[in-house]
């Protein structure tokens, strides 16, 4: 599957790396690498991480034993230009990559003013893309209004919105509202992959229904 106008080819499932980091399960680099490697060997080629997750070393360790193609998305809460530049370079450095495929404004709970408040960080991502440090500029969000807003922001290539069958974590609307926003973004040729299809683990006993709910949204290219 291809992520919108960015043209980045990814597997239908995306491996979200957050749970293995210190913010959640806090497993060792070695153990985390083993789990990531299993995912890669099973056919997943798309990893989603972030500066705040402290999991770059887990990914780097896994990739030492893997020669296939891997697409990596990361993100940062940086608001200013220089801060975001360091975040992008840090990701390349710690994961030993020449470039990061997708780099997001990490904006989970921010409102539609995010693009104004973080204009410096966004300008930096645009420059990093021109310089080849990243391949695509994105935003990760829990808010319906931010997805709608991002659809109209030319610089944004990829949107990573929260969506699950019970609406866990969605800000400012229902799952149906979020799907409408996703459709608008898709019409604007944005690449979209779904965040928290299992509601951060709350829907673990309903895995099949939860994954299928998101898979049936035609405008979603991959599911994390």
Model-derived segments and their meaning:
Residues 108-224:
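Beta/alpha (TIM)-barrel catalytic core signal, keyed to glycine-rich beta->alpha loops juxtaposed to Asp/Glu
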Residues 4-10, 41, 59-69, 89-98, ...:
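Acidic (Asp/Glu)-rich catalytic clusters
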Residues 92-113:
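Active-site groove signature of glycoside hydrolases
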Residues 18-30, 73-83, 111-114, 203-205:
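Active-site mouth loops of central-metabolism enzymes
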Residues 1-70, 124, 130, 213:
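N-terminal binding-site loop/beta-alpha segment at the start of enzyme catalytic domains
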Residues 25-39, 81-96, 141-149, 205-213:
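Short, acidic/polar
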Residues 1-2, 56-57, 84-90, 144-145, ...:
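Alpha-helical scaffolding within the catalytic cores
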Residues 2, 10-14, 45-46, 69-73, ...:
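Structural preference for beta-strand elements that scaffold enzyme active sites
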């Amino acid at each position: 599957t291809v992520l919108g106008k960015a043209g980045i080819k990814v597997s239908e499932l995306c491996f979200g790396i957050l749970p293995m980091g210190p913010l959640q399960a806090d497993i060792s680099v070695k153990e985390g690498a083993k789990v990531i490697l299993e995912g890669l060997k099973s056919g997943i080629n798309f990893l989603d991480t972030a500066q705040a997750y402290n999991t770059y070393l887990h990914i780097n360790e896994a990739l030492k034993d893997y020669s296939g193609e891997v697409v990596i998305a990361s993100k940062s809460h940086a608001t200013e230009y220089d801060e975001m530049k360091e975040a992008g370079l840090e990701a390349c450095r710690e994961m030993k990559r020449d470039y990061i495929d997708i780099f997001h404004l990490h904006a989970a709970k921010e409102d539609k003013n995010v693009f104004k408040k973080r204009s410096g960080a966004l300008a930096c991502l645009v420059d990093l893309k021109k310089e080849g440090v990243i391949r695509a500029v994105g935003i990760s969000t829990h808010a319906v209004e931010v997805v709608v807003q991002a659809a109209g922001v030319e610089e944004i290539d990829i949107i990573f919105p929260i969506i699950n069958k019970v609406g866990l974590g969605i800000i400012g609307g229902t799952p149906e509202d979020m799907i409408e926003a996703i459709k608008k973004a898709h019409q604007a040729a944005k690449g979209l992959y779904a965040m928290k299809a299992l509601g951060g683990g709350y829907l673990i006993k309903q895995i099949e229904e939860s994954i299928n709910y998101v898979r049936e949204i035609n405008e979603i290219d991959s599911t994390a």
